[in-house]
């Protein structure tokens, strides 16, 4: 009965049933396709394109297109996609995630939907987590070239012309980072011909869970350098190092948040010679202290970062790789440099930013593939509208997954791991040990060295040999220690005689916060029906159980004499571990969802600004838009005097005149008698008419093309300057918005409302400055459009673009920069 209900209501079952019917039809064409000549098989591409032009849909040609691509794969590579790979390809075509076990041929699977969707001519992006995989997978391009399609490879070092050529190909292989950075750079160009991307159509994301889940909280940032005194970081670090936990500062183990106590604040005032640490003039110092606290007590050497060649280098928490050239933001990187006593680098200012969540949601259709996604299906469905379809394996999985071994402490656990490795190594069985932290991999390495057991260590410190180490990890007698499953994306193939020894033995040194990461480690063994064995060793001292485990079980076992090297292998305790993992997964999902809610505010604003930029770049003339901007600025000046009532007072007229005569009007200035007593709308119309006369006279002898270039150059520069500042302002707003919860106010609601208020103010300032510059600047021939900062260098490079800062001192009798029309001394300068 329950199986019947599952068939009726389970989306995955229904989809697999539908795909199997289509796969049968594709399979039925196999013999027909195999009889065709190469020329005739390749000619199908043009036939398919013509049918699409005549109004047929991709679904109409799907069966034939898959059959053609399947046969082409066999002729080019000698590999014909299995039936299960047809199912995976169909799942991907329909915008789902195909969960396929390690070794089931995901790379070959994606050839089928990529070919079909490339026939539209709108472009297909195949996305990988690093350039090694992009380069490796693009070698499959022979299939596409055989079928008459163009294929590009998007690498970081390409020039913009080479990138344009790559993006114009039917199929593009790229990393997720490079796609995102290209998008941001495209929205900072000052000429449309310098863009590289086409409209985003369809993408297939390999290791989709890594990119859309693990990296979802990490924004892509293009940044420029900002000078900040290194002494302040050093002084804050010196002060923080003198503090005592629980007396001067407290740390939340779950969130890793660190904050000063009252006593810590008192000591800060004493150290920095202040009356009140939290005085408004000390906000920069408080920020430096907070970052120093985080650097010293929440960030760990060889876990979150390493020190290499006198530099702090970030460790990717999900891949274990070093992220050379990248820097923690908001001064945290500099605080860590002060902590470790290395040279303090220049701080950065954000010029453009986007998260992967919002970037990938811009595609018309998105799909993915991975070996582990089912545990995160709710998140994929809610955020990306993708279902996870578990594709049956070509051969049954015969790997043995043993129940966890639980130890009282880490010492006993590590001794047991070494003994297990020793026993299996003695038989010649290859062993792969997965660790979470670099320090664990190095500790186990030292213990193995003492036992004189030859082994390889694969972590962020030696990832250059990754492919070589992984290639030999399945050979007889091999022992490999890998941090956070470095080497993902590369299969571990068993050497000669290893099957008879039981296949690859995988040992987990502790449970990861996510069951999905544990499943990835297990999945390294037992590929394509091979034998294998997996076992996790856990202890009550592991971070996961310290933070989320049950003290009740720990105390109960302690009372029963559970100490030292003793171990328990019980499903009840394994469920305790899984329960802790579910708590963390749920917590992390909530965090990512909340972050997306916040990021959506910024995303909507980004779309408006980028829309304005694209309008400037794509249109031959923006003259009408500029004139509308004049009127909006004049309306803002007049409306700023209508806050208390709908009528203008006597002194309002004189203040409005003072503002427009100084900032806008030159020849056609207005007298008080011309507007006194008039309705606000009449005042706006009169000022606008005179501004228009002034501007038209200014343009009298200027060719239209010069006028258009002048208006575009001014508009782009003003928009880009204000957008850069707005990103920083919104970042500061977000940093402090959490405190609103203490006032029974929703932080998200407050952030949304205040964020849009700041955005409206920015738009008003943009209209103001464009209007003033256009009316008061001298029009020059051959005016050059300039970017506000260099964009070729991003936050994952050692160097940073320099921000061109404009310093303007406002005089007491000058118009207030807020745009009110009042004098500075009577407005913000009071």
Regions found by a protein language model. Give the residues of each.
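Conserved P-loop NTPase motor core
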Residues: 1-561, 610-611
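Extended, charged helical/alpha-beta scaffold domains that provide interaction surfaces
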Residues: 306-313, 319-326, 528-529, 541-809, ...
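Hydrophobic, well-ordered secondary-structure elements that form the walls
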Residues: 433, 481, 723, 759, ...
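A short, cysteine/histidine-rich metal-binding "knuckle" motif
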Residues: 810-814, 819-830
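Short, Lys/Glu-rich amphipathic helical modules
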Residues: 427-441, 619, 645, 672-676, ...
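Generic detector of short, well-ordered, non-transmembrane alpha-helical segments enriched
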Residues: 376, 429, 477, 605, ...
């Amino acid at each position: 009965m329950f199986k019947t209900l599952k068939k009726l209501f389970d989306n995955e079952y229904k989809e697999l049933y539908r795909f199997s019917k289509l796969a049968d039809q594709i399979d039925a064409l196999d013999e027909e396709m195999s009889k065709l000549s190469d020329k005739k098989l390749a000619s199908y591409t043009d036939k398919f394109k013509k049918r699409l032009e005549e109004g047929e849909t991709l679904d109409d040609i799907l069966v034939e297109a898959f059959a053609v691509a399947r046969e082409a794969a066999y002729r080019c590579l000698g590999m014909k996609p299995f039936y299960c790979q047809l199912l995976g390809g169909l799942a991907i075509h329909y915008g789902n995630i195909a969960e396929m076990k390690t070794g089931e041929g995901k790379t070959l699977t994606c050839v089928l939907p990529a070919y079909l969707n490339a026939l539209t001519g709108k472009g297909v992006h195949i996305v990988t987590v690093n350039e090694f995989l992009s380069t490796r997978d693009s070698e499959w391009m022979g299939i596409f070239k055989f079928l008459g399609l163009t294929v590009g490879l998007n690498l970081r070092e390409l020039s913009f012309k080479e990138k344009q050529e790559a993006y114009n190909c039917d199929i593009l292989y790229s990393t997720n980072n490079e796609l995102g950075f290209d998008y941001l750079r495209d929205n900072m160009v000052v000429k449309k011909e310098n863009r590289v991307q086409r409209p985003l159509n369809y993408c297939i994301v390999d290791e989709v869970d890594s990119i859309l889940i693990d990296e979802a909280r990490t924004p892509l940032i293009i940044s420029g350098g900002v000078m900040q005194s290194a002494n302040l970081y050093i002084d804050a670090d010196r002060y923080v190092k003198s503090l005592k936990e629980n007396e001067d500062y407290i740390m939340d183990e779950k969130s890793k948040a660190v904050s000063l106590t009252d006593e810590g604040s008192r000591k800060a005032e004493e150290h920095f010679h202040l009356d009140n640490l939290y005085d408004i003039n000390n906000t920069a110092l408080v920020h430096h202290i907070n970052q120093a606290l985080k650097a010293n007590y929440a960030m760990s050497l060889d876990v979150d970062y390493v020190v290499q060649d006198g530099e702090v280098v970030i460790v990717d928490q999900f891949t274990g790789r070093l992220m050379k050239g990248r820097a923690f933001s908001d001064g945290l990187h500099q605080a860590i440099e002060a902590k470790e006593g290395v040279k303090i680098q220049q701080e950065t200012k954000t010029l453009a930013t986007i998260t992967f969540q919002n970037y990938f949601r811009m595609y018309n259709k998105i799909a993915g593939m991975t070996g582990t996604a089912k545990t995160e299906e709710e998140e994929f469905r809610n955020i990306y509208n993708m279902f996870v379809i578990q594709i049956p394996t070509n051969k049954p999985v015969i790997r043995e997954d043993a129940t966890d071994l639980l130890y009282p402490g880490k010492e006993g656990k590590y001794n047991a791991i070494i003994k297990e490795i020793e026993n299996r190594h003695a038989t010649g069985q290859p062993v792969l040990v997965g660790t979470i932290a670099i320090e664990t991999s190095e500790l186990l390495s030292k213990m193995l060295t003492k036992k004189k057991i030859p082994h390889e260590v694969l972590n962020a410190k030696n990832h250059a040999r990754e492919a070589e180490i992984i290639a030999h990890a399945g050979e007889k007698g091999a022992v490999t220690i890998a941090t956070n499953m470095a080497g993902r994306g590369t299969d571990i193939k068993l050497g000669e005689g290893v099957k008879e020894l039981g296949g690859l033995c995988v040992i987990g040194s502790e449970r990861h916060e996510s069951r999905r990461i544990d499943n990835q480690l297990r999945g390294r063994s037992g590929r394509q029906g091979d034998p294998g064995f997996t076992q996790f060793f856990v202890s009550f001292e592991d971070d996961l159980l310290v933070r989320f485990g049950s003290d009740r079980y720990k105390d109960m076992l302690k009372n029963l004499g559970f100490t030292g090297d003793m171990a328990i292998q019980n499903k009840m305790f394994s469920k305790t571990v899984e329960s802790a993992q579910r708590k963390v997964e749920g917590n992390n999902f909530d965090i990512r969802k909340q972050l997306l809610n916040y990021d959506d505010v910024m995303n909507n604003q980004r779309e408006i600004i980028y829309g304005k930029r694209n309008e400037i770049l794509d249109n031959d003339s923006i003259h009408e838009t500029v004139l509308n901007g004049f009127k909006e600025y004049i309306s803002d000046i007049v409306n700023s005097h209508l806050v208390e009532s709908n009528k203008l007072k006597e002194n309002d007229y004189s203040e409005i005149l003072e503002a427009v005569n100084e900032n806008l009007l030159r020849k056609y200035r207005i007298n008080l008698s011309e507007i006194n007593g008039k309705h606000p709308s009449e005042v706006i119309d009169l000022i606008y008419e005179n501004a228009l006369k002034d501007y038209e006279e200014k343009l009298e002898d200027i060719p239209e093309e010069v006028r258009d270039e002048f208006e575009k150059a001014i508009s782009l520069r003003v928009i880009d300057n204000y957008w850069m500042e707005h990103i920083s302002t919104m970042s500061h707003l977000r940093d402090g918005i959490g405190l609103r919860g203490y006032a029974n106010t929703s932080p998200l609601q407050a952030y949304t409302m205040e964020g849009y208020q700041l955005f409206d103010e920015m738009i008003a300032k943009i209209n103001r400055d464009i209007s003033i510059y256009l009316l008061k600047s001298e029009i020059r021939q051959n005016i050059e459009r300039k970017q506000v900062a260099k964009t070729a260098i991003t936050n994952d490079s050692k160097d940073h673009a320099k921000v061109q800062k404009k310093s303007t001192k406002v005089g007491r009798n000058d118009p207030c920069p807020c745009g009110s029309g009042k004098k500075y001394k009577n407005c913000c300068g009071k």
